Amino acid sequence: MKISVGKKVKDLAVISSDNKKMLSDYLNKNLILYFYPRDLTPGCTTESNEFNDSLNKIKRLGWNVVGVSRDTIKSHEKFINKYSFKFPLISDESEKVCKMFDVIKEKSLYGRKYMGIDRSTFLVNRELEVLNIWRNVKVKGH
């Protein structure tokens, strides 16, 4: 199933930095789910810090923030601790969440092609319905 605005996403088992077990465990509020390529890299750090800096305002508006990458929980814990993030990160080493949201894309770095995460953000309501999608976003001001 291709993810699009208005579609419902499946509830999936997840491995997260805050020990939540299912995607729906985050749905006590609406959810900002952002996918980023890699922990502790300049662009991903900037993006995550901007979410963290805006977190109080985001929560007052009724939203939770959760980041997703293919990094390990150990890597996520280092990332969270180094920058004092106040939101959880999902470890998607199996790519099941990434594939469901269709964020694994062919990329190129120094002429080498590889499959990586396309920086994307999804708004998902409490009923697991996708409200909005931003794909291939720029880091700054995201």
What spans do the regions from the language model cover?
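Chalcogenol-based redox active-site neighborhoods
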Residues: M1-H142
